Amino acid sequence: MYNNIVKNIKSVNFLLNVLFIFGSEMMIYGIFRDYSFFIDRLTMRLASINILYVKIFQAFALNNNLIDDKTNNKLLKFTDNAPWDYSDINLYELVEMSDKYNIRLPFGYEKPINAGMISLVFIGYEKNDSNEKVIIKMKRKNIQEKLDDAINNLLFSMYILSFIPIINKYQLSEVVNKNVEIIRHQTNFIKEIDNMDKIRENCKHLKYVKIPIANRQVTEEYPNIIVMTHIEGIKINQIPENDYESFAKLVVKFGLV
């Protein structure tokens, strides 16, 4: 019972904090009338609590046409290149895994090349004759506990806000529950490898589709890590405009597989 009381107090503090952030940023927006500036500040302040809240805000805003494509892409880039610090790296586990599986990290153990909401990404090379380049995807340290706390705060807030009629109009609870389930699936690395294998099998006859091959043994021993082959490519938002049509046709074919 004591734990539930503490949890509810934390959730109330979270709700009050978020309401203060939104309220203060709305006041600043009322003064400067700069929507892009408003989104930037709001994003950074939500991320300082938990990056998950940025993802939920993005889904809510997009679902209710509160942001345009340009702003949505900006938020996508933010969540795909999320802030991180050294406390997010489980250094002991990363060093132990790389030593056991003979992987060299040329940029060191404290320099990820990318940071998502759930994981940090490192470049590595196998210590053998092939010197094959690999990607090491590692969950942020204590991410499961942080996500659980964030989700509990959100669900508690949805319950409180459900008593306000205007909130129901924006289907906020539906957006939160949908995204919470998606995010929970992203923390299961064995399931992610299963999905990669399934897609690779389904697309084996599509020459233009390349799916990384993951070392399942690594993840079975270190559930917070995926080691996979590196594939050169570009992000979808980096595709030249004159290639949109041909790329779209390939995406449609891929979707039909």
Predicted segments, located by residue:
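Broad phosphate/nucleotide-binding scaffolds in NTP-utilizing and phosphate-metabolizing enzymes
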Residues: 1-256
